[in-house]
């Protein structure tokens, strides 16, 4: 897993916030921490984030990308729920998200040669989106 964190503001505040972020990452068991010290390094880190969907596509040419929004405080629980739902359907699921605004992109990877897989993908995607919008028991989400 990769966590890309960007800190913005005036120089003194950015330095202080960066130290807080670094300490939180270390306390959470981060195996590696990289800090961009130039705009070139920053762009290189962002290139990795932007290339994520291409990497998924190279490994799994058939995937279904969703776009949901949840309160930031709910992201850990939603991530667990999304992975549990994907697993219950037998799908691998990658997750990319903008944690700062609660926007997440669960990506279901599947083999299109499997009989009925597209129906299962859409059913699974519907369950995931119901998690994201808080529909637990009733209601409907149209997934196309």
Set out the residue ranges of the language-model regions.
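Noncatalytic alpha-helical scaffold of FAD-dependent oxidoreductases
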Residues: 1-144
